[in-house]
Amino acid sequence: DMEDDFMCDDEEDYDLEYSEDSNSEPNVDLENQYYNSKALKEDDPKAALSSFQKVLELEGEKGEWGFKALKQMIKINFKLGNYPEMMNRYKQLLTYIRSAVTRNYSEKSINSILDYISTSKQMDLLQEFYETTLDALKDAKNDRLWFKTNTKLGKLYLEREEYGKLQKILRQLHQSCQTDDGEDDLKKGTQLLEIYALEIQMYTAQKNNKKLKALYEQSLHIKSAIPHPLIMGVIRECGGKMHLREGEFEKAHTDFFEAFKNYDESGSPRRTTCLKYLVLANMLMKSGINPFDSQEAKPYKNDPEILAMTNLVSAYQNNDITEFEKILKTNHSNIMDDPFIREHIEELLRNIRTQVLIKLIKPYTRIHIPFISKELNIDVADVESLLVQCILDNTIHGRIDQVNQLLELDHQKRGGARYTALDKWTNQLNSLNQAVVSKLA
């Protein structure tokens, strides 16, 4: 496993055979010591560490065998959870990148170490790791590695919701992709898209739709790049969230579908999440189209997480509150644990409750609020706030008598509007009739 071993060992050894002077006697000892140490790695990692230390003692001047030994020591310490020692060894390895190994080899090695350590869930450790790397790269002038490390640090700040620190990194990243006159350098399209994706995620998390909209449009106009589908997935997912929050359900639907296809292509588990969002947009736009008719989405139709969402759709379309809430309860973790879905499920629940409420109160002039509460299966306080909302937006004409816990309906007012319209219509007919009569006279 290439990632597991900080690059395939055979490839490393191949590199070394041609870069070392094979007549140099000490190299044979170093090589033997290195391979003996490596043989101990699986069964006795602690003995392997002592043995790799001997490689460092034998090498005298910094060279590739020491570099290789340090890589193995970083890996073993990471696996053993000896993080302070791992950091010490990493700092030691970074002193080799200026002269002891070739630029290309050190870049490949650090890249693979970064990818490997990035699997850790220890935020503080990762932060120290990335910052140490960036410090070492200040002198090394390695733009690609600098960009990659900064992007990883940016993602870390995004996860930790440290937006001030993230903005500082975004500024540096943007500057690295600008022309002399401060415009986006379109020759760096792929990197630009990565920066946009990071920034778009930040504004999505902050619910700053104004900034998000401008960036989102810009990102879709970068044509020079061959974007990684994962990056495009991130951008389209954020676009979908933005459109959904603005009530543009069809645009959201399109974006979530594009995001799903991109995530699917890159093998990202976010594809299932985006399918859920697609179903959500489908409900909100009251679409009759089945999102699972498409060739890409069909294989996921019976995925348990997706199934819960599709069952939700049919309960929603039938205004079946009991079933809707039952599905939410049974599948609480895979629906309501997602803050974005939770944000909109409440809107869907309000829509259903309003429909049921209107049907429920139709025959009455006065109705007890506790009775509505029982029928809708929500607290009296929630019924009152729903009624207030409906009265304010003229869905219901009436008033709440809080003392007696009653809703008094003004059917006359409701009929009154109809009566006024009829009256207006009769008057118009009258005047039309008079105009015709006077013409004929």
Curated annotation (Swiss-Prot):
Composition bias type Acidic residues, residue spans = 1-23
Residues in a coiled coil are: none
Keywords in UniProt for this one?
Cytoplasm, Nucleus, Signalosome
Q: Could you tell me which SUPFAM superfamilies the record lists for this protein?
A: TPR-like (SSF48452), Winged helix' DNA-binding domain (SSF46785)
Q: Which InterPro entries match?
A: 26S_Proteasome/COP9_Components, PCI_dom, TPR-like_helical_dom_sf, WH_DNA-bd_sf
GO annotations under biological process? protein deneddylation
- Residue numbers spanned by region Disordered: 1-29
Q: Which residues form the PCI domain?
A: 252-414
Q: What is its main location?
A: cytoplasm
Q: Does the keyword Glycoprotein apply?
A: no
**Where does the record place it?**
Cytoplasm; Nucleus
Q: Which GO terms describe its cellular component?
A: COP9 signalosome; cytoplasm
Role summary = Essential component of the COP9 signalosome complex (CSN), a complex involved in various cellular and developmental processes. The CSN complex is an essential regulator of the ubiquitin (Ubl) conjugation pathway by mediating the deneddylation of the cullin subunits of E3 ligase complexes, leading to modify the Ubl ligase activity.
Subunit record text:
Component of the CSN complex, probably composed of cops1, cops2, cops3, cops4, cops5, cops6, cops7, cops8 and cops9.
Task: Family membership, please give it.
Answer: Belongs to the CSN2 family.
What protein am I looking at?
Answer: COP9 signalosome complex subunit 2
Q: Which organism is it from?
A: Xenopus laevis
This protein's encoding gene: csn2
